[in-house]
Amino acid sequence: MSRTNFNDLLEAGSHFGHLKRKWNPAMAPYIFTEKNGIHIIDLNKTVVKVDEAADALKQIAKSGKKILFVATKKQAKDIVADKVKAIGMPYVTERWPGGMLTNFATIRKAVKKMATIDKMSTDGTFDNISKKEKLQISRERAKLETNLGSIVELSRLPAALFIVDISKEHIAVAEAKRLNIPTFAIVDTNSDPNAVDFAIPANDDASTSIALITGVITKAIEEGLAERKVDKETQAEEKEGTKTSRDEAEQLSAGAKVKSSNDGEAKGGAGKKPRRKINS
């Protein structure tokens, strides 16, 4: 059963593309028709592509790896932040930090700087500096948080990127491609679907379309995380069961050895004749 359907996508306005004069010819396979100078996306193909992307991302989440969401356009940032925050995945909804992926070591230094400032505020260091210095450090920390967002929790490169509007986020797409990081994206009629690994043909401007598709994707990831948790619990139970069985077997074996030893002593004692008393 599909994770979404034609009617839901239609109601969300996912079928509306861009003006014909702004189209990217590579999107031709996903265009159903043209109406009033606007390309109409074939939602039957969108349903298929949503399922493909959702299933792949579910498996990535199940493996325990991180998926980075990128959506800095006004109508997408709040929607994506809310939905992605709920599943504990990192996201960038402000400006994309250049070199975020290709120069990840430098980004990590900025993250460590944030951590250092946080430590200063709790270990009493702030009490020994002037108000001016304190204000400067606080502003620096706020700027870092705005630029880095939730990626402060990202200790290593993400296993995949999910992007809203690859034309706007072309730098993120290019960095991911350079590092062979799989890319998933909502791709409108003005963009090249071949620029990403999993393209979902749909309106990437309407908030309703973005919310619907992002919601389906985050739900699939949530399923993957839940299955991972169940698998880990099952493995722990099996491991504990194996240990218990081994301990019981060792106890039985030890008990059998003791019994065998006692039986041997008893038999040896029974075979001896009592010593004859000699009268002097």
Regions found by a protein language model. Give the residues of each.
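Intrinsically disordered, compositionally biased charged tails
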Residues: M1-R3, E223-S280
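Ribosome large-subunit tunnel/peptidyl-transferase-proximal elements
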Residues: S2-E233
